[in-house]
Amino acid sequence: MSDIDNNLTSQTHQQATHQQETLDLSIALLERPSVTPNDDGCQDILSERLTQAGFDCEFMYYGDRQAKGEHAEVKNLWARRGTSNPVICFAGHTDVVPTGDEKNWTYPPFTPTIADGYLWARGAADMKTGIAAFTIAAERFVANHPQHNGSIAFLITSDEEGPSINGTVKVIETLEARQEKITYCLVGEPSSTDTLGDIIKNGRRGSLGAVLTVTGKQGHVAYPHLASNPIHAAMSALSELTNASWDNGNDYFPATSLQISNINGGTGATNVIPETLEVVFNFRFSTETTEDELKAKTHAIFDKYFKDSKAKYDIHWKLSGQPFLTPEGKLVSACQQAIKSVTGTDTTLSTSGGTSDGRFIAPTGAQVVELGVRNATIHQVDEKVEVDDLGRLAQIYERILENLLLD
């Protein structure tokens, strides 16, 4: 047998081993109905394995144990092996979104099922298989290279699919307070589109939400001179707002966009001018525009139209995350090389999509990249992931560790 044949045989065997180990751990995690913010024991499974691999594991709890909703207690796991730099951290979440009516699922959402080449379960794509793949990759890397350079870390939360106020952001605050820095962060969100590794996210747009409240005076529709219609007062300003150009984007980001998601006004009666109007809108913004610039331009538009109006307006702002970008460099290159070596794919860099917990990590100075399985079924009924991708993803993650910690 030639050296080429030996290498191919070895690679095939390695992939099969990675796949079975990743599949087994994925199933163990997917069996837990960890609907946000409930971890339901997933992090205990990870902690036990990582401790055996030489990681120091620390559970971090934030929030109120007695509360529900956004103030509920959240369980987070910080695990680290090594004390030196660079620190490569895998960030992920064990919580999942609700299933909806389980009768609509082909297979029970918390009974992981292998069928037609897929692993079906809530959280299969978003993102328990990603957590499993990196865990297997870390275990195998540590076993093969116990004296590796730098450190490997895990930051796992159960508050990514919810309000995201007692999860990753609080862990990062704790790490920053004790001067514990992440050099490279690999977020295991499902980034791929058509094939494993075809897309990696090297940045995300910022998200700035707003609730506009316009207050007028209620009255009869037949006597408009005795009332002040907040809907009429806002129409011209909203028209200009939705047609405004905010920036032209850049090589990494599309132009900043605005979308109105909700408009509420009226009493339900057809003969009553309402007193108030509420409009909810959101900016997804690039690095070409700042939060303050968006606010200032928005207020300038409304000030222009409300200057002589009897109605008054107020805007409540909520920033969900600043835009971030990891330019092509060591982390991006390590990911590209790993994907190419395992799948043969030349990956594409992208900043599309919604927000992720990477928005809390990037401001610390860490290079952040998102790389995971295909995202075609995330948050949907019959969420699933290709079984063959599990072993390959674990291999990709292991190659990334080799690229960053062995040179």
UniProtKB/Swiss-Prot annotation:
Its cofactor is Zn(2+); Co(2+). The active site is at D95, E160 (proton acceptor). Its EC number is 3.5.1.18. It comes from the Bacteria. The keyword NAD does not apply. It catalyses: N-succinyl-(2S,6S)-2,6-diaminopimelate + H2O = (2S,6S)-2,6-diaminopimelate + succinate. InterPro entries: Bact_exopeptidase_dim_dom, DapE_proteobac, Peptidase_M20, Peptidase_M20_dimer, Peptidase_M20A. It holds the Pfam family M20_dimer. Keywords: Amino-acid biosynthesis, Cobalt, Diaminopimelate biosynthesis, Hydrolase, Lysine biosynthesis, Metal-binding, Zinc. Zn(2+) 2 binds at D126, E161, H379. Binds 2 Zn(2+) or Co(2+) ions per subunit. GO terms for biological process: diaminopimelate biosynthetic process; L-arginine biosynthetic process; lysine biosynthetic process via diaminopimelate. Residues 1-20 are annotated as: Disordered. Residues 1-10 have a biased composition (Polar residues). One of its GO terms (molecular function) is cobalt ion binding. Homodimer. Catalyzes the hydrolysis of N-succinyl-L,L-diaminopimelic acid (SDAP), forming succinate and LL-2,6-diaminopimelate (DAP), an intermediate involved in the bacterial biosynthesis of lysine and meso-diaminopimelic acid, an essential component of bacterial cell walls. Belongs to the peptidase M20A family. DapE subfamily. This is Succinyl-diaminopimelate desuccinylase. It comes from Psychrobacter arcticus (strain DSM 17307 / VKM B-2377 / 273-4). The lineage of its organism: Bacteria, Pseudomonadati, Pseudomonadota, Gammaproteobacteria, Moraxellales.
